[in-house]
Amino acid sequence: MHRYQKEIVRLIKLSTPVLIASVAQTGMGFVDTVMAGGVSATDMAAVAIAASVWLPSVLFGVGLLMALVPVVAQLNGSGKSKKVPFEIHQGVYLALLTSIPIMLVLYNAGFIIAAMDVEPELYEKTQGYLHAVLWAAPAFLLFQTLRSFCEGLSLTTPAMIIGFIGLAANVPLNWMFVYGELGAPALGGVGCGVATAIVYWLMFLTMTLYTFIAPKLRRVNLYENWNKPQRKEIYRLFKLGLPVALSIFFEVTLFAAVALLVSPLGSTVVAAHQVAINFSSLIFMIPMSIAVAVSIRVGHKLGEKDLDGAKVASYCGLAFGLLMACCTAILTLIFREQIAYLYSDNQEVITLAVSLMLLAAIYQCTDAVQVVAAGALRGYKDMNAIFKCTFVSYWIVGLPSGYVLGMTDWIREPMGVYGFWFGFIGGLTTSAILLTCRLLWLQRNPTRIDMEVDELQIMH
């Protein structure tokens, strides 16, 4: 029991800075939503629809780079930290290469919005946001590369501090570009995209400065000898991260596709849906931060070839994540009306958002289990299993069931946006079951785990 208690303490110490950093980053979305809503419901809806294109695109790149965390953690755990700079340098090249297609997708995303038959004003504002925020993509991915470097070495505080710097900068920049203060143009919701691009470049430059001067990182010497791009190594990182990227993409696009599918239902429905989704994203940062900590701990233990320790870390993470989810679900049920008032003063938006947050509270527990289980599997480098489980859960179960319930009369009268939220519940519950079963199976087959650890050591 004492071993489990010590592991939970380690997870809390690792996950708390990750949580605060993630909340700060997600808080930027909260600020964008609130400040755009201060202009009009149309501007608020434009930010929501644009985010449904921007986030899946850029988080696909983040997923590719998340493979660096267990790689760095295992090298550090096995006493081979001198090989870390080479991996990070190749990660930088991968980030730059990945940002190019992401920027092209964002620039040409207008046809996706037009296909949803939205109002002309909403279309123009959404496209304007995307054309502004596309310049954030390279900075976002480069920042993620350096963040993975720090987190793989169990240094989770730097991203937390820099996340707050970004959030603090986002508010005045939004104030300038949304409302036209200090001589800046009044761009409304489009101004949120301009502010976001500036903020992510600021965060990347700040993280670069930290990794250059931090005493704790001197032993690694990240910038002493810069490695040239190695095609085979970049491809290996891409291949390792692709299942993670696709699994994140499938989850995010489940929510993004719903935002697009409900857009013909009107700005009020889109705005209420955005309120509930944005708050759910804030709450999701708690189990997500625990998942990052579990991935680090499992990777580190595998580097030490301590398979039992890796198992303890994953079990503690699942228990802790589920406990926190139960607490947040209860708080959401109690305070959902007050929360909705933070986002909007439109009574129709508030009424619908309150009912949607009731459904959000229901799926928080299974959402926590699935994300922590996926974090443990990332630590085991069992990336393909994550990809398969999430694909089935989100695109075979979640989205189709949501569409059938929400937009057709095959089962009952169309439920509108509520049907899609029941689809969320079904998809996330399926994901939790499949990923947990896979984790338990993997831990009962230690030969498979030993092979993966040995493979890592051979490659390096």
UniProtKB/Swiss-Prot annotation:
Molecular function (Gene Ontology), one example: antiporter activity
Membrane topology (UniProt): Multi-pass membrane protein
InterPro entries, per database record: MATE_fam, MATE_MdtK, MdtK-like
Pfam families xref list: MatE
Keyword Signal among UniProt keywords: no
One term under GO cellular component: plasma membrane
Gene it is expressed from: norM
Main localization (coarse): membrane
Protein name, per record: Multidrug resistance protein NorM
Transmembrane feature ranges: 18-38, 53-73, 94-114, 126-146, 159-179, 185-205, 242-262, 276-296, 315-335, 349-369, 391-411, 415-435
Task of the protein: Multidrug efflux pump that functions as a Na(+)/drug antiporter.
Organism: Aliivibrio fischeri (strain ATCC 700601 / ES114) (Vibrio fischeri)
